[in-house]
Amino acid sequence: MTQQKPPAGADLSQTFIRFALDAGVLSFGEFVTKAGRKSPYFFNAGLFNQGAMLGEVAQFYAKTLLASGVQFDVLFGPAYKGITLASATAVALAGMGRDVGFAYNRKEAKDHGEGGTLVGAKLQGKVVIVDDVISAGTSVRESVNMIRAAGAEPAAVLIALDRMEKSGTAEQVGTHSAVQDVQREYGIPVIAIASLKDLLAYLDASQDPALSASREAVAAYRQRYGV
């Protein structure tokens, strides 16, 4: 895959969706979520597993963060996917003239060497949490607690895709999404490169019959579980 810098502005989310489709990170079919719901699409950020691909996705993260206007001093990547995403985003930001530190946590505390659960830059000032998606919000909750315990302030959560999906199971559907719960509980914005709304807009505009055929199933899923 040839690495290209993503555009700025309103086209960013649509370009990201095309990029995710080309990379196989976003796919359509019938998938079962952790909540037991049958989803017509699947987003697997673990497939951003090539150097050029990771460099490109980092550009999307960096451009989205800068465009948000959120003030920040450090990036924090929760283990495990967030580690790579935060470090790659820091590299992309440096290339744009915004050089900041990044840190991440270990799942298990280390009792030798530097010790503890935190690795990397000191958590200070305003910290942006970088991850792939927000499912139940557990990772964000743990990250916020670590950031505050270090004396820093959580400033925002930066993710690739907002599924805009109510919490709960296939039968018991909640009233809010995990993203909305995070924003309400911690009073910080959740910034997404793209959302389910953007995905539907992409499918509406697509000239690809295979993609257009998925539009009805995605729209029905949003009707049932979306916010």
UniProtKB/Swiss-Prot annotation:
Binding-site positions, 5-phospho-alpha-D-ribose 1-diphosphate: 34, 80-81, 106-107, 110, 112, 131-139
Pathway: Pyrimidine metabolism; UMP biosynthesis via de novo pathway; UMP from orotate: step 1/2
Cofactor: Mg(2+)
EC number: 2.4.2.10
Function: Catalyzes the transfer of a ribosyl phosphate group from 5-phosphoribose 1-diphosphate to orotate, leading to the formation of orotidine monophosphate (OMP).
Membership in a protein family: Belongs to the purine/pyrimidine phosphoribosyltransferase family. PyrE subfamily.
NCBIfam families assigned: pyrE
Protein name: Orotate phosphoribosyltransferase
Organism, as annotated: Cupriavidus necator (strain ATCC 17699 / DSM 428 / KCTC 22496 / NCIMB 10442 / H16 / Stanier 337)
UniProt lineage: Bacteria, Pseudomonadati, Pseudomonadota, Betaproteobacteria, Burkholderiales
Gene responsible for this protein: pyrE
